[in-house]
Amino acid sequence: MDAMATATQAGDAQAAFAGTLTDKLKEQFDAGLLSGQELRPDFTIAQPLDRYTDTDHAVWAKLYDRQASMLRGRVCDEFLQGLSTLGMGRDRVPSFEQLNETLMRATGWQVVAVPGLVPDAVFFEHLANRRFPASWWMRKPEQLDYLQEPDCFHDVFGHVPLLINPVFANYMEAYGKGGLKAASLGALDMLARLYWYTVEFGLIRTPEGLRIYGAGILSSQGESIYSLDSASPNRIGFDVRRIMRTRYRIDTFQKTYFVIDSFDQLFDATRPDFAPLYDELRAQPTLGAGDVGQSDLVLQRGSREGWADSDDV
């Protein structure tokens, strides 16, 4: 293929990310990783194992050790079981292909490598077909505690172990199918809130107390402590209508965490047709991330200490 054709293909691939072209994606295009030959129509790429540096593996090991040492007694048993079943090691960034050998046998899911955030429709299509799109690249050593977009550690360590659990795996598939429908109904904002407050920042009630299952918490040292120990945030019982009305924070720890009783409760919430629910909720005002209502099942009303004054998403 001549240079002009290659450049045209790369330009077409870059244009496909319109609206989601982050700095990390631009970096990969500039490096030639995402030429038209590399990027598939579903926005996946072959995981470039040969591009991981010693620094990448060291960052993975440091994050893995840090989180694994503090999560026992904080994270739900289902996550620990999934981590053990997958045999996800600490020494190196894992091979997605090797993870998939176990994951496919367990629940029919697989991890697919993507260069970063992908368009909504692509994301939902992957989930609906039991494919979890995971960023292949690792954060830099100076980004251990804060990263603007999800990297491989967040996506793989934070999300993938729970896909071993059949009920949670079913929920994720149902969410993907629901997302495809929500897009056609103009309701992505409401469905995004459900993902945020469950898959990313959810807590679960167990006989031993509250435990973490949300990947955004699991992959963060600070929020792993804050979400369970701090008096600042609200902790409110799960209510799908309430969640779909509630704005959230992307720049600080959460003001509110929603608590499920079980993964069955979470999956059952996705069974009804959401179309009438979207119509109902459009007629109601959205709620701030820290709001507490009279009908809420309040497990703990937050002290509000340290809350940011900026607007919620």
Positions of the model-derived regions?
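The feature captures two recurrent sequence modes
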Residues: 1-163, 255, 260-313
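Extended, Lys/Arg-enriched charged tracts that mediate electrostatic binding to polyanionic substrates
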Residues: 177, 181-215, 219-222
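Residue-level preference for alpha-helix termini and adjacent loops
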Residues: 152-156, 170, 174, 202-203, ...
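Short coil/turn segments at secondary-structure boundaries
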Residues: 113-118, 170-172, 186-187, 209
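A recognition module on extended beta-rich or small alphabeta surfaces enriched in W/G with H and D/E
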Residues: 217-285
